[in-house]
Amino acid sequence: MQDQLICSGCRRVVQYRRGVAGVCCPGCNTLTAVNPSAVADMSELICSGCPTLLFYNRGASNIRCPSCNRLNSTRSANQIAHLTCGQCRTTLMHPPGASTVQCATCRYVNHVRDARPQTVLVENPKTLDDKGKLVSNVVVGVTSWKR
């Protein structure tokens, strides 16, 4: 199982295997100690105002982005999906339903393959047919939310 921490040298997000005492950043070679209790109490989300990855304590209800100053609600943080960049193999987070995700490391545009199809029900107002009967206008379809 893997986890993530922020490098104490360059502030990049670094992945590591759970159970290790320290992580060497591949970008700047800084050794960052792993604090198991702090990692277990942390969560992450992507800022709703910019593409910044934010880390916060699980008990927090809101977190302010240091990049764009937007206040983010942590209630929807569990609605994050992950994929691996097809070019540099970096783990990326994205909102469910996204059709593409651009990697912040190498700028490669990744197509989300597992965008789950969803059933959509559209109910328009009832109308009268040529005989004066009230008719329902309901359409059912399936979409993957790709635009």
Swiss-Prot record:
Region spans: Putative zinc finger 2: 44-74
Taxonomy, superkingdom: Eukaryota
UniProtKB keywords: Nucleus
InterPro entries: LSD1-like (IPR040319), Znf_LSD1 (IPR005735)
A cellular component term, taken from the record's GO annotations: nucleus
Subcellular location: Nucleus
Chain segments carrying region Putative zinc finger 3: 82-112
Region (Putative zinc finger 1): 4-34
Main location class: nucleus
A Pfam match: zf-LSD1
Function: Putative zinc finger that may be involved in programmed cell death and defense response.
Name of this protein: Protein LOL4
Organism from which the protein derives: Oryza sativa subsp. japonica (Rice)
Source taxonomy: Eukaryota, Viridiplantae, Streptophyta, Embryophyta, Tracheophyta
